[in-house]
Amino acid sequence: MNLDEYGGASKGLIWDAIERGLPIEKYIAKKHFSFMTLNYLITVLSAKHNLDDFPFDEYDDDQIRHLLAAVYFQNDWKEWANPKMKHYIMEMFVTVKNPQELLYYYNRGFKYRELLQIYKFINDGFDPKVVDNLNFNFQQMREIRKALRGRLPVKDLANPNLTWKEIRAKRIKAYGHRYGIEFYIKNYDKL
């Protein structure tokens, strides 16, 4: 086992894992890992998860880190992961309540910013079918999600022909002009 390519902090992690009896040598012999990925790997091995069939060769370091998090949280990553998926999209799949629903939108070609809004729809407990339309951009989706969180009916707002500013204006107007603006200013960071 050659540890020369690892920095001091990474070497310390590896030696600590070896002293604890974790089988880390067989994984680091195959591939070089970053410090963060080593942390995830050691955590997963400490939790007694089996990584014998884990495809380390198919994924890059960032992707492996998110897949190890999925293994740790017992998320079935084999249903949604593929080597072409960006690591920041994988991060959403690890923590989303319904990965199959997010996968549906990912396969339809939604970009990261739109997927992030869909992810928030799902985790807030709303049905993302409200914006099941490729004509919506992420700003329109964000305003519709804010309306749903404010318990407003979105029939009039879920119109791809409206700009996000028009949707925001209708949303504030639905709260009542005075109350809507006060609510918007006080709760901007929560919406």
Predicted regions and their residues:
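General marker for long, soluble alpha-helical cores
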Residues: M1-L191
